[in-house]
């Protein structure tokens, strides 16, 4: 599946979540908060959200903070709550830091959808592109193949506060220890 198709599917699923009947009301409003604005990954996601919203006849848009800062995401979510959106989608920079504001959104009847945050508590739905375990193991196998299954390695994640990034790393490390120690 291409990234463009993936963003279209994810946008469609997110928009479908806001309607219990499956039919979209013209007053459906979805705000999506990215980790950071202006980077290719989230630019493509934004294009998919806008395209799918147009097809469905609903209002949907993405907000991208200027830096990968949880406080900026909290502020963006507060703004979406004040705007009275139907649903909020978010790719958390810090899952724990967002819990209070996501709880606030849900208490106001706003549907909350997350991505890359499998253990997030105050959500109606979290989605992932792939199994964290299999993703980590696949990358571990690539590393083992390139290094002949020997040597030392370092692990980097996008952020220590993003649960999914750490799940990928934990899976890779466990796989390497089990199969190449």
Regions found by a protein language model. Name each.
Residues 19-20:
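N-terminal signal peptide c-region/cleavage motif recognized by signal peptidases
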Residues 3-11, 23-181:
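A residue-level marker of the well-folded mature domains of exported/periplasmic proteins
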């Amino acid at each position: 599946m291409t990234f463009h198709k993936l963003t279209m599917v994810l946008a469609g699923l997110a928009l479908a979540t806001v309607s219990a009947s499956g039919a979209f009301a013209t007053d459906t409003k979805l705000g999506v908060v990215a980790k950071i604005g202006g980077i290719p990954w989230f630019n493509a996601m934004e294009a998919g959200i806008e395209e799918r919203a147009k097809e469905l006849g609903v209002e949907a848009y993405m907000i991208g903070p200027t830096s990968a800062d949880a406080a900026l995401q909290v502020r963006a979510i507060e703004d979406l709550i004040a705007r009275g959106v139907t649903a909020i989608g978010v790719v958390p920079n810090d899952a724990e830091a967002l819990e209070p504001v996501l709880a606030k959104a849900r208490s106001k009847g706003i549907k909350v959808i997350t991505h890359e945050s499998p253990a997030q508590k105050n959500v109606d739905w979290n989605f992932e592109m792939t199994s964290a375990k299999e993703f980590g193991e696949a990358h571990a196998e690539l590393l083992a193949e390139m290094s002949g299954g020997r040597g030392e390695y370092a692990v980097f994640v996008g952020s220590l506060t993003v649960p999914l990034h750490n799940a990928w790393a934990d899976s890779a490390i466990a796989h390497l220890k089990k199969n190449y120690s």
